[in-house]
């Protein structure tokens, strides 16, 4: 009974393949046919196929014969022969797309013409003037792009270093004005290291104790003038002559008179 059921399922599978290839619709069973099929399935009776089996076709397909048995194809039926030809081509040569379909696909896309660089017209190059930047302006722009902790830039381009002293309730302590932002940042690092030790957040941690000299501060003109006076000669005070308050038009004549009085000589 199991062999009969297998052959029926194989036949139904091949029939569905044939109908799919030929574009036919699935047959609609009537009520009487459906009831007979249901009764035969319940009672275990086998349903006879419509077409007879031809063993000559199954000899060409050993793999089909091993799994499905003989194929239910008729030699006199044109539809069965069409199915046989399709299966034969698929078994021996494999499925290959037709050349006509590939040609149609190629013709559906527009042709693209690729031009070589030689076909392009030569374009005259326009000379571009390169603006020369001075090293001072380049250094200023580079310094503006980077910000250091505890450093503020003055409006005139110099850099001031400041730090908040925790001993003075976070008041700002001015550390000086420097030429570059790096010098101001280094001055801040050294002041922060002296106040907070290893807990301080530094700009250059490796340069704090490297033995570098202290950055040079920018001194104001007033302080530099006072320091030069302290180190040099004393200040010159303006002295007014005895007759400074007189009118310019008044002239004073002085005469020297020698008077001899005994042994002494008096000059008046």
From Swiss-Prot:
UniProt entry tagged with the keyword tRNA processing: no
GO molecular function, one term: DNA-binding transcription factor activity
Chain intervals for the UniProt region annotation (Disordered): 215-244
Cellular localization per UniProt: Nucleus
Primary location class: nucleus
SUPFAM superfamilies the UniProt entry points to: DNA-binding domain
GO biological process, one term: cell division
Residues spanned by motif Nuclear localization signal: 221-237
Coiled-coil annotated spans: none
Disulfide cross-links: none
InterPro entries: AP2/ERF_dom, AP2/ERF_dom_sf, DNA-bd_dom_sf, ERF_plant
Stored CDD domains: AP2
Tissue expression notes: Ubiquitously expressed, mostly in flowers and rosettes after ethylene treatment.
Family that this chain belongs to: Belongs to the AP2/ERF transcription factor family. ERF subfamily.
Record's function text: Acts as a transcriptional activator. Binds to the GCC-box pathogenesis-related promoter element. Involved in the regulation of gene expression by stress factors and by components of stress signal transduction pathways.
Entry comment, domain topic: The AP2/ERF domain binds specifically to the 5'-GCCGCC-3' motif. The affinity of this binding is higher if the seventh amino-acid of this domain is basic.
Name of this protein: Ethylene-responsive transcription factor 1A
Species the sequence originates in: Arabidopsis thaliana
Species classification: Eukaryota, Viridiplantae, Streptophyta, Embryophyta, Tracheophyta
Gene: ERF1A
């Amino acid at each position: 009974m199991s062999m009969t059921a297998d052959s029926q399922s194989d036949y139904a599978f091949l029939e569905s393949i044939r109908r799919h290839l030929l574009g036919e619709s699935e047959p609609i069973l009537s009520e009487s046919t459906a009831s007979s099929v249901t009764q035969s399935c319940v009672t275990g009776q086998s349903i006879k196929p419509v077409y007879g089996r031809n063993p000559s076709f199954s000899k060409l397909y050993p793999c089909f014969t091993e799994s499905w048995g003989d194929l239910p194809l008729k030699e006199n039926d044109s539809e069965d022969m069409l199915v046989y030809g399709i299966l034969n081509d698929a078994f021996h040569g494999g499925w290959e797309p037709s050349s006509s379909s590939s040609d149609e696909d190629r013709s559906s896309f527009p042709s693209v013409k690729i031009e070589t660089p030689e076909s392009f017209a030569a374009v005259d190059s326009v000379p571009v003037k390169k603006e020369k930047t001075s090293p001072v302006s380049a250094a200023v722009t580079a310094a503006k792009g980077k910000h250091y902790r505890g450093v503020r830039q003055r409006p005139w381009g110099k850099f001031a270093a400041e730090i908040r002293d925790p001993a003075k309730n976070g008041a700002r302590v001015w550390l000086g004005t420097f030429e570059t932002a790096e010098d101001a940042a280094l001055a801040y690092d050294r002041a922060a290291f002296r106040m907070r030790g290893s807990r301080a957040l530094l700009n250059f941690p490796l340069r704090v104790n490297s033995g570098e000299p202290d950055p040079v501060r920018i001194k104001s003109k007033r302080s530099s003038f006072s320091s030069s006076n302290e180190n040099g000669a004393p200040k010159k005070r303006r002295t007014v002559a005895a007759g400074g308050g007189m009118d310019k038009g008044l002239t004073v004549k002085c005469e020297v008179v020698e008077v001899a009085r005994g042994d002494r000589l008096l000059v008046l």
